[in-house]
Amino acid sequence: MATSSLTKPQMRWPSGPRRLRFHIVGAFIVSLGVATFYKFAVAEPRKKAYADFYRNYDSMKDFEEMRKAGIFQSAK
């Protein structure tokens, strides 16, 4: 039996691979931009806010305020 190799189907657009490469590169660039924006617009300010809060945080003071307010039943 003689076997013949099948031919690959022709792409729909003549510029198909080039267009696909353009969109993949574009999507990669956009995703890097969004990740960078999120890091500097959301994550860094949040990290700074947490650091500022815990720099001056006194857990014993908060505990005493909650105890005086009557939140805890076991610590009177």
From Swiss-Prot:
Example GO biological process: oxidative phosphorylation
Ranges that cross the membrane: 14-55
Family: Belongs to the cytochrome c oxidase subunit 6c family.
CDD domains, A to Z: CcO_VIc
UniProt subcellular location: Mitochondrion inner membrane
Positions on the Mitochondrial intermembrane side per record topology: 56-76
Function as written in the Swiss-Prot or TrEMBL entry: Component of the cytochrome c oxidase, the last enzyme in the mitochondrial electron transport chain which drives oxidative phosphorylation. The respiratory chain contains 3 multisubunit complexes succinate dehydrogenase (complex II, CII), ubiquinol-cytochrome c oxidoreductase (cytochrome b-c1 complex, complex III, CIII) and cytochrome c oxidase (complex IV, CIV), that cooperate to transfer electrons derived from NADH and succinate to molecular oxygen, creating an electrochemical gradient over the inner membrane that drives transmembrane transport and the ATP synthase.
Name assigned to this protein: Cytochrome c oxidase subunit 6C
Keywords tagged on the record: Membrane, Mitochondrion, Mitochondrion inner membrane, Transmembrane, Transmembrane helix
Listed pathway(s): Energy metabolism; oxidative phosphorylation
Subunit note: Component of the cytochrome c oxidase (complex IV, CIV), a multisubunit enzyme composed of 14 subunits. The complex is composed of a catalytic core of 3 subunits MT-CO1, MT-CO2 and MT-CO3, encoded in the mitochondrial DNA, and 11 supernumerary subunits COX4I, COX5A, COX5B, COX6A, COX6B, COX6C, COX7A, COX7B, COX7C, COX8 and NDUFA4, which are encoded in the nuclear genome.
Membrane topology annotation: Single-pass membrane protein
UniProt keyword annotation of Chloroplast present: no
InterPro entries per record: Cytochrome_c_oxidase_VIc, Cytochrome_c_oxidase_VIc/VIIs, Cytochrome_c_oxidase_VIc_sf
Organism per entry: Sus scrofa
Domain of life: Eukaryota
Mitochondrial matrix topological domain residue ranges: 1-13
PANTHER family named among the record's database cross-references: CYTOCHROME C OXIDASE SUBUNIT 6C (PTHR48416:SF1)
